[in-house]
């Protein structure tokens, strides 16, 4: 997937589409979660599309939000992007985009399914 100008994408992080280009997940509206980055890509000095990132679909572990934690009531429900490594239970009044579906929650974090 072509990377957005100025983007830094970290291996294992949530990748979103914004304006047709890949960038790191963050709390914002109108982002489309694409999956997990399989590599680190630095396009901080590049233009739109200068770099490409491989994105994988599947079920991956992310940190649980300290401020808006995902609990067992969220199983099989949408969870929301707080940053590229953290998900939350709610969209914070419309301030966050969906990450994917909560597959499981345990002491290590939240298992998010990207389809």
Identify the residue ranges that each predicted region occupies.
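Surface-exposed, low-hydrophobicity beta-strand/loop segments enriched in small/polar/acidic residues
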Residues: 1-115
